[in-house]
């Protein structure tokens, strides 16, 4: 059924009755790579090669690659990603415009709050 990539090898074999030798033809066996099972980042099920899609180094089923907001099926040319979440371009723009920045528009704490002024010790001088 399958043929090996290499030529057949001749291997000597001893005849059980007379101790004579004969030649047995064996084909080189081809190695089957152990395939790593890849799982979909959205549904955590096995992804087979025909349904595999990679976006931002994450693996998805074609059908699982959807907008987080409206669940529309996305393609590699029609998505925008932020913080590991995927959006269709219209919703990405709509959510971004609603607050005017990435953090608030997508329900996160504003980055500037992380840099809020801390209380300064009254004994220290500031320039």
UniProtKB/Swiss-Prot annotation:
Zn(2+) 1 binds at residues 40, 43, 61, 64. GO terms for molecular function: actin filament binding; metal ion binding. Induction: Over-expressed in breast, bladder, melanoma and thyroid cancer cell lines and tumors (at protein level). GO terms for cellular component: actin cytoskeleton; cytosol; nucleoplasm; plasma membrane. Interacts with ILK. SUPFAM superfamilies: Glucocorticoid receptor-like (DNA-binding domain). The keyword Zinc applies. May play a role in tumor progression via its ability to activate the ILK protein-kinase activity. The gene is LIMD2. Its main location: cytoplasm. GO terms for biological process: actin filament bundle assembly. Residues 38-98 form the LIM zinc-binding domain. Acts as an activator of the protein-kinase ILK, thereby regulating cell motility. This is LIM domain-containing protein 2. Residues 1-24 are annotated as: Disordered. Keywords: Acetylation, Cytoplasm, LIM domain, Metal-binding, Nucleus, Zinc. It holds the Pfam family LIM. It is found in: Cytoplasm; Nucleus. Zn(2+) 2 binds at residues 67, 70, 88, 91. InterPro entries: LIM_LIMD2 (IPR044115), Znf_LIM (IPR001781). The keyword Coiled coil does not apply. PROSITE patterns: LIM_DOMAIN_1, LIM_DOMAIN_2.
């Amino acid at each position: 059924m399958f043929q090996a990539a290499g030529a057949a090898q001749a291997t000597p074999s001893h005849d059980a009755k007379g101790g004579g030798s004969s030649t047995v033809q064996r084909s080189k066996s081809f190695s089957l790579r152990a395939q790593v099972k890849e799982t979909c980042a959205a549904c955590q099920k096995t992804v087979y090669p025909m349904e595999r899609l990679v976006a931002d180094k994450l693996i998805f089923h074609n059908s699982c690659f959807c907008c987080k907001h409206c669940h529309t099926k996305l393609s590699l040319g029609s998505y925008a990603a932020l913080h590991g979440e995927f959006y269709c371009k219209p919703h990405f723009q709509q959510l971004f415009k609603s607050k005017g920045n990435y953090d608030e528009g997508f329900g996160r704490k504003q980055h500037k709050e992380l840099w809020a002024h801390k209380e300064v010790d009254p004994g220290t001088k500031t320039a």
